[in-house]
């Protein structure tokens, strides 16, 4: 690679940038050729055993919580979520830093979106959408994430793929799960992807003090997430001339639209 820095080997420095293997000094070619990988073949392992082994092998490595969730959720769900992450939205549109990419925060955002959609459609309770909580969520849906739930998430992501063909500064980690839920609301109201993108751009250009406050410290707590959902939902209804009370709320029925907090127990 052209950006490869100078390396030191056996007391000498070598410039490797932009060179092929055949262009390297003989001593480096020899050192590389003599390197051996330790490969172990595990036969007759079930997928559950392989997933457990992966988690245990990496438990001593500094993996992020969401990376550990890949071992917890199982092969089937990994394949499902990985397929959704290959679309335009998660590969081109979201605003993600290099460090976030290394932690696989795109998967975290997708898990957060799935969790919030589960809350909206099935009343799944949650206290936070932190990475650690999403790790537990990933384990809890293993073997129980129905085709109906998959289709809801799949349709929302496809809608986002169509709505955002290029990078959008608003699509940061804090906002993506909220936008994903609102994409589902937009679908239900017959809003096209292009018009939805117009709404998001308009929302991003306006001042929303309550939304901004809920995006600060503690932004992964349920109350803050619900406040952001509430503010974007009300802005959505105003933008498209919809009566908020006649549109499906972006969260479970146990959350009050006029408060953005959990309803009191009767």
Residue ranges of each PLM-predicted region?
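Basic- and aromatic-enriched surface patches that contact anionic nucleotides/nucleic acids
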Residues: 1-128, 252-257, 261-265
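C-terminal subdomains that position terminal phosphate/3'-OH groups for nucleotidyl transfer/ligation
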Residues: 110-266
């Amino acid at each position: 690679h052209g950006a490869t820095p100078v390396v030191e080997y056996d007391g000498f420095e070598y410039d490797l940038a932009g060179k092929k293997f055949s262009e390297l000094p003989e001593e480096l070619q020899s050192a590389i050729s003599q390197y051996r990988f330790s490969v172990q073949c595990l036969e007759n392992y079930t997928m559950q055993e392989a997933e457990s082994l992966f988690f245990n092998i990496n438990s001593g490595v500094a993996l992020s919580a969401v990376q550990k969730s890949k071992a917890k959720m199982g092969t089937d769900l990994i394949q499902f979520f990985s397929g959704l992450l290959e679309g335009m939205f998660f590969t081109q549109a979201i605003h993600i830093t290099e460090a976030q990419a290394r932690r696989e925060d795109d998967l975290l955002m997708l898990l957060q979106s799935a969790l919030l959609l589960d809350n909206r459609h099935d009343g799944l309770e949650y206290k936070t959408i932190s990475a650690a909580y999403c790790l537990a969520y990933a384990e809890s849906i293993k073997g129980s994430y129905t085709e109906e739930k998959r289709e809801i998430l799949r349709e929302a992501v496809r809608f986002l793929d169509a709505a955002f063909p290029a990078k959008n500064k608003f699509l940061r980690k804090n906002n993506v799960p909220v936008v994903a839920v609102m994409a589902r609301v937009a679908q239900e109201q017959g809003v096209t992807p292009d018009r939805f993108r117009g709404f998001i751009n308009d929302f991003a250009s306006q001042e929303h003090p309550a939304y901004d406050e809920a995006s600060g410290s503690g932004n992964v707590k349920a109350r803050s997430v619900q406040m952001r959902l509430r503010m974007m939902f009300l802005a959505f209804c105003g933008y498209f001339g919809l009566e908020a009370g006649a549109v499906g709320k972006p969260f479970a029925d146990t959350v009050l639209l006029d408060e953005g907090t959990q309803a009191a127990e009767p």
